[in-house]
Amino acid sequence: MPQVSMRDMLSAGVHFGHQTRYWNPKMGKYIFGARNKIHIINLEHTVPAFNEALNLITQMAAQKKKILFVGTKRAAQKTIKEQAERAGQPFVSHRWLGGMLTNYKTIRASIRRLSDLTTQSQDGTFAKLTKKEALMRSRDMEKLERSIGGIKGMGGLPDAMFVIDVEHERIAIQEANKLGIPVIGVVDTNSSPEGIDYVIPGNDDAIRAIKLYATAIADACLEGSKSSASVPNKDEYVAAEDGAAE
């Protein structure tokens, strides 16, 4: 199973929190101390918490469950998109649209619209339209791709959500909480761990730290999917037994 060591975290700067004046007292138990007015996160908490989350993700992926990657702030966007795509998992990296989970029926209609427009752009429909109409549909498609393209293949609500910067993604977390979807969240010293089922105390701003988290989560997804592919499902067992009986 994928594991991340304390050395990995130290080299990625996971232990650097925010300036001490911005701290959230609810994160007190995860803080080791302060250096140059910057809180230092106690990695003795972070390492086991993150590895527990990785084990959970591996097990979920082995059961073909969907993990939604969420990171819409600039420092996280590129990495979240790349790693979720690598793992074959849904993601939101542009902007969280209110109701993305709690009003999924409406979102599903937008996904259908995006699918229709994509088909039209490929089957020659756009070429038959006026230049203005084709441009309008093309822009509509690009806008939808940017906002919901990462979840177009989700096929329903996710089974868990992985979040970078829980303060920035508070609306997404509230929606997940309302629906009972477990949340794995990277929580910095200025944030509240409330509503987070699996708290990963750590730096949520440094690109190297964000890469470390997202890459490890993606690796766990791939590890789980691989083990799932190597285990025959129930129907295959039945077929094999029937064949042997004959």
Swiss-Prot record:
Membrane-spanning parts: none
Superkingdom of origin: Bacteria
GO MF term list: structural constituent of ribosome
InterPro entries: Ribosomal_uS2 (IPR001865), Ribosomal_uS2_bac/mit/plastid (IPR005706), Ribosomal_uS2_CS (IPR018130), Ribosomal_uS2_flav_dom_sf (IPR023591)
Alphabetic keyword roster: Ribonucleoprotein, Ribosomal protein
GO cellular component: cytosolic small ribosomal subunit
GO biological process: translation
PANTHER family named in the record: 30S RIBOSOMAL PROTEIN S2 PROKARYOTIC AND ORGANELLAR (PTHR12534), SMALL RIBOSOMAL SUBUNIT PROTEIN US2M (PTHR12534:SF0)
NCBIfam families: rpsB_bact (TIGR01011)
Protein name, per record: Small ribosomal subunit protein uS2
Organism from which the protein derives: Cellvibrio japonicus (strain Ueda107) (Pseudomonas fluorescens subsp. cellulosa)
Protein's gene: rpsB
